Regions:
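Walker A/P-loop-proximal flanking segment of P-loop NTPase domains
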Residues: 1-48, 52-61, 65-71
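Structural recognition of the conserved hydrophobic beta-strand(s) that form the central parallel beta-sheet
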Residues: 146-150, 171, 175, 188-195
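Extended alpha-helical interface modules used as scaffolds for assembling large macromolecular complexes
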Residues: 281-396
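Amphipathic alpha-helical segments of the small helical/lid subdomains adjacent to P-loop NTPase cores
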Residues: 202-206, 213-291
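Substrate-engagement module of ASCE P-loop NTPases
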Residues: 135-138, 167-188
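Short glycine-rich substrate-engagement loop in P-loop NTPases that contacts/grips substrate
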Residues: 99-100, 118-136
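P-loop NTPase motor core
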Residues: 9, 66-114
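Conserved P-loop NTPase "ATPase switch" module shared by AAA+ and STAND
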Residues: 141-167
Length: 396
């Protein structure tokens, strides 16, 4: 069976387009906020396409509509091009010390400024991140810059159990965001993504005026695949999967519709908006399934994904015997946990049992099942998460 578009192995927008790979077009949603200035923050679990979103924004602001004419935003976007400072904070999250972290942050920022074609004649690479950024921004008069930060939370999450290092990194990052705020007049647009919301912390109070799109029902499908998108962009892969699965099982059990239902139970039913308007599938799991399903069942990578996240470390520090039993009961019986919307993104300066369900939500282990008068009911989204989370909780 031939496919009009290949499945992408990269999160880079330009590579996806140039290689004629499947790109799920959400640019109409991008148009709804990218014409504004921000700053915006957007939180979603790992694997939901945040890096592709950042890459799409980078290409849009740097190149205009050059690579977007055939996409939905092609008829909506009228803006000019800009210099883009694009940072990925996950690139220096594993620093061995505060000084190493600061030096790695400097290198990442210096490279990003250079890639944005900004003049670096008067700056030194060994300046602190805040000083380095300030020296560049003070010489810019108009709103000619776009700032994009991917995985902003990665350096803090990596040391969440080490209070001393967490506090040191938090201070460095807080100074950086204070600089961004001080020079907000030079930015045309600021957009920041991550998994865990640390901006609720008093340490980041200098940047707490950013608009959070995470719970906004208008952007519930900004990350993740809806069922309509699965049908639209992956229909040939669904049909091929049916043929392979029927061959493997020596039956005609799988049809287009019931495979969709199976995928929803295993990889879908995530909801992150406060009106329960949009339900989405995990993109990385869907692409993995279709990529690996050839002549045998794909190996599951869900458990590995959980182990590679901060969840393992977090649970080891907060799970008492009673809370562990309570959580396992919720997993086994499918019991929902009610949480005030205001508590979904609490102040996270340290690990506590009080933050357990909020962290589980932010990392994608729980999602919104119902919403009423500011109270959100949280539950396990699907079978894969249920199995992986149960195994993880039992092991810690």
């Amino acid at each position: 069976m031939e496919f009009p578009k290949e499945l992408s192995k990269t999160s880079t927008f330009r590579d996806i387009i140039d290689n004629n790979c499947v790109y799920v077009d959400k640019t109409d949603l991008i148009a709804k906020f990218a014409y504004l200035k921000g700053p915006f923050v957007f939180f979603r679990p790992r694997g939901f396409g945040k890096s592709t979103l950042i890459s799409s924004l980078q290409d849009l602001f740097e190149m205009g509509l050059d690579n977007f004419h055939s996409l939905k935003i092609g008829r909506l976007w009228k803006d000019k091009t800009y210099k883009v400072i694009k940072l990925d904070f996950s690139s220096f999250k594993e620093s061995s010390s505060t000084e190493d972290f600061k030096a790695s942050f400097n290198r990442e920022l210096f490279t990003a400024l250079k890639n944005a074609n900004l003049s670096l004649n008067k700056v030194q690479e060994n300046d602190g991140p805040s000083d380095l950024l300030s020296e560049i921004l003070m010489n810019i008069d108009s709103t000619d810059l776009v700032l994009l930060i991917d995985n902003y939370d990665a350096p803090l999450t990596a040391v969440l159990a080490d209070k001393t290092e967490f506090t040191s990194r938090q201070k460095i990052l807080s100074n950086f965001y204070s600089t961004v705020k001080s020079y907000q007049g030079v930015f045309r647009f600021v957009f920041i993504t991550g998994e865990i919301n640390y901006f609720s912390s008093s340490t980041f109070s200098s940047f707490n005026l950013s608009e959070d799109l995470s719970l906004n029902s208008d952007f519930g499908a900004l990350a993740g695949f809806t069922e309509d998108e699965l049908e639209c962009y992956f229909s040939p892969y669904i049909d091929r999967a049916c043929k392979i699965l029927n061959k493997l099982n020596k039956s005609n059990k799988y049809t287009h519709d019931n495979l969709l239902s199976t995928l929803k139970r295993k990889y879908g039913d995530y909801c992150f908006d406060n009106k329960c308007k949009e339900h989405v599938y995990n993109p990385s799991f869907i692409v993995h399934f279709f990529s690996e399903l050839k002549e045998e069942h794909p190996n599951s990578h869900i458990s590995e994904s959980f182990r590679n996240s901060s969840l393992d470390n977090f649970l080891r520090h907060v799970l008492s015997k009673d809370i562990k039993e309570q959580l396992l009961k919720c997993i086994d019986l499918g019991i929902s946990i009610d949480l005030a919307q205001s508590n979904l993104y609490p102040q996270l300066d340290m690990l506590t049992e009080r933050n357990l369900y909020a962290i589980l939500y932010q990392l994608g282990n729980l999602c919104i099942k119902a919403s009423r008068k500011g109270i959100l009911s949280l539950g396990i989204p699907n079978l894969e998460v249920k199995q992986a989370l149960k195994e993880l909780v039992k092991d810690v």
